[in-house]
Amino acid sequence: METSFKQTTSNKVERYRLFLPQFELLISDEKEEISVLANTAAALREAFGFFWVGFYLVKDDQLILGPFQGSTACYRIHKGKGVCGTSWAEARTLIVPNVEQFPGHIACSSLSRSEIVVPILACLLYTS
């Protein structure tokens, strides 16, 4: 299976419109959650050129680094710490245009300037 998610249009709405059906096809038959997360990160980064895309998985009271695409990342983030830990603790999406203005920001990479964190609080990828 060879799939390219590179986009040629600069229109953001059009890019998402083109991405979604292709992405749904990519993950439609896969049952392994880690594999789906890995390809999700790769597809999003390729399609939109994001600096870093990835997942942290909950283990006890920490977020543990999961599948990602981009530069190296922090292995563990405690609940309520940094943008990711705060998003998880508050159960809400956080959009941070300037990470240097976010109290308690964890600088995993000095190249990262902004973050969008979407907590996936309960997820069942497939039922059978």
For the regions a language model picked out, list residue spans one by one.
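Intrinsically disordered, low-complexity terminal regulatory regions
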Residues: 1-69
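Short loop/turn motifs at secondary-structure junctions and domain boundaries
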Residues: 47, 106-113
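Conserved small/polar residues in nucleotide/adenosyl-binding loops
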Residues: 126-127
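Regulatory sensory and allosteric helical modules in signal-transduction proteins
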Residues: 58-108
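Short hydrophobic beta-strand micro-motif common in sensory/regulatory domains
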Residues: 114-121
